Amino acid sequence: MPETPASDLVRSLLLTVPDFPQPGILFRDLTPVLADGPALRAVVDDLVAACGPVDAVAGVEARGFLLAAAAAYASGVGTLAVRKAGKLPGEVLRETYALEYGEAAIELHPGQLAPGSRVLLLDDVLATGGTLEAAARLLERAGYEVAGIGVVLELADLGGRERLAGHDVRAILTL
């Protein structure tokens, strides 16, 4: 992906924290990007423009919520929350996905949009792709079309894009 003003801003603001949350992990901290108004605007504008018209924007808990709300506002559409299991009351759709040690689950309220609605799915980082793959399945099970998947940062060595084959994936910055 060619460099853009958004990718330049992300690269300049991204923090790298060694040994967090445990020894041997090189954590990429995007909070400075989200805290910078021009950077956030550039990121959201690029993610929205890459997808085309949508009916809603879904965000994966937790930082995906921030991106989804901003993108939905910029697009004049609503937002959907893909939550960690046990956080939504009432009827939910649930998808489990593998973690390095064990598994996790995410949930979505069904029936929030008309069947066939186009939804842009956003999260902060694409690593192994497990969470976004599960989130895309949730949206499809709810009867929606995943119009695109957008992230601020893709960690290419972890192979997440391959797990999302068949989806249009846009990363602002790939490392």
UniProtKB/Swiss-Prot annotation:
The keyword Transferase applies. It is found in: Cytoplasm. GO terms for cellular component: cytoplasm. InterPro entries: Ade_phspho_trans, PRibTrfase_dom, PRTase-like, UPRTase/APRTase. GO terms for molecular function: adenine binding; adenine phosphoribosyltransferase activity; AMP binding. Pfam families: Pribosyltran. The keyword Glycosyltransferase applies. Gene3D superfamilies: 3.40.50.2020. One of its GO terms (biological process) is AMP salvage. Pathway: Purine metabolism; AMP biosynthesis via salvage pathway; AMP from adenine: step 1/1. It catalyses: AMP + diphosphate = 5-phospho-alpha-D-ribose 1-diphosphate + adenine. Keywords: Cytoplasm, Glycosyltransferase, Purine salvage, Transferase. Its EC number is 2.4.2.7. Coiled coil: none annotated. Belongs to the purine/pyrimidine phosphoribosyltransferase family. Catalyzes a salvage reaction resulting in the formation of AMP, that is energically less costly than de novo synthesis. Homodimer. This is Adenine phosphoribosyltransferase. The gene is apt.
